[in-house]
Amino acid sequence: MGGIPNYSLMIDYINHCGDGASADLSAFQFRTKSATNRFIKAVEDCFLNFKSDEHKSLFLSALASNDFSFEEKLVVLYWQIVCCNNLFREITDNVFLRALYSGRSSIAKADVEAYLKYIKAKEPEELNWSDSTIANSASKYLTMLKKFGFAAGTLQKEIKAPHLSSALFVYLVKLALTVYPDERTLANPLFRFSFLDNQSIITRLKTIEYIPLWNITQIGSDITITLK
């Protein structure tokens, strides 16, 4: 995914073909048939796997909606690849978010490489990559963060956490409860990728504007969310 030059192209493709409909791929101006096939496979593997029809509808509707800006749609893409791609999710959780939540202002390629080498040593059957493949993958991961709008710079990537608008926050809550319907608390795995701490999530969940959307039950620090 790091090799795709423009993520607006990816959004256009998903809007044309995400529901299984065929489209005239000549509009996407790939130089070769093999480049077209690589693009399609990358998008389908990373973004077009769904837990349910409701998940699929929620994601495709968000990308097609005029209620989200392009920058917000990039965040929607980020949450979707977190749902679809185990390795991206693991790197993000253990490298990018760990750096963000610990107060670091930047991450480097070496951070990602070190984590990939750790996975290789721990689970060689899962990640039997050469050092050059690991280095290339680390570079592509940071490129993806930059294209999502979460990083800036060249060697040392400055971390740029996005602001979650009301529309994005509502989407996140609905997505979390759709993908993990049995996890209606703050332990829902997707909340880890929200760029918000638990208290900030609770505060926003209780905001008056969201009363028509969900019910909140709180006992101590435990909170349960039920969509209306």
Q: How should these model regions be labeled?
A:
Residues M1-R98, I107:
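Eukaryotic partner-binding/assembly regions in large regulatory complexes
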Residues G103, K117-S137:
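Short, positively charged loop/turn segments that connect secondary-structure elements
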Residues N49, R98, Y118-K122, M144-A151:
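Amphipathic alpha-helical interaction surfaces
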Residues N86, S106, A135-S139:
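Alpha-helix initiation and capping sites
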Residues R31-F39, D131-K147, L196-T207:
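Short amphipathic alpha-helical interaction segments
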Residues V43, F47, L116, L205-E209:
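Hydrophobic, Leu/Ile/Phe/Ala-enriched alpha-helical segments that form helix-helix packing faces
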Residues K146-I223, L227:
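Accessory, usually C-terminal, subdomains that scaffold auxiliary metal cofactors
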